[in-house]
């Protein structure tokens, strides 16, 4: 992203969460294209959309679902603005379940914006946004906070499995 920002003719903003950056997707990265998301793994029925620092948690969920026999699509949402309209159009009709993962609060985040766009596109998928609650977040390490608010890979996986179980 830094190389993209240096070469982009216009303003660019980064969000740097506290802690070290994950390199979990480093070996499968594609060049950054302005306003475009990155499809890490193609899949069917379930789309997992990860924003920023949630990549490592989302990959953990993806791997657990894969071991259960679900071939989910894993998408790295590189840009919040502009949104990847082609990706939104594609997932609007191609999936039964769409899950977003972001380390922000629910209100006004990527998941809320995406849900609005999906609704406008007539999407009939079950959409669930995973984010922190719209409340004061207590102090703690990133790991402590993710676990406390159910945003760690294990908790996210269990929530999704419950949703899938209830839909079958």
Predicted features by range, described:
Residues 6-168:
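Thiamine diphosphate
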């Amino acid at each position: 992203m830094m190389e993209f920002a240096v070469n982009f003719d216009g303003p660019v903003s980064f969000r740097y969460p506290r802690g070290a950056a994950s390199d979990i997707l480093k070996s499968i990265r594609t060049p950054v294209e302005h306003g475009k998301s990155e499809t890490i793994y193609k899949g069917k029925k379930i789309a997992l959309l990860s924003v920023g620092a949630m990549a490592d948690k989302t990959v953990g969920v993806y791997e657990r679902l894969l071991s259960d026999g679900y071939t989910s699509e894993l998408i790295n949402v590189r840009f919040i603005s502009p949104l990847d309209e082609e990706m939104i159009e594609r997932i609007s009709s191609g999936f039964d379940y769409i899950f977003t993962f972001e380390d922000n609060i629910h209100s006004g985040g990527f998941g809320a914006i995406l849900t609005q766009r999906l609704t406008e596109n007539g999407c009939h998928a079950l959409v669930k946004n995973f984010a922190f609650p719209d409340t004061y977040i207590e102090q703690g390490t990133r790991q402590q906070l993710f676990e406390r608010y159910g945003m760690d890979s294990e908790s996210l996986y269990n929530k999704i499995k419950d949703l899938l179980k209830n839909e079958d």
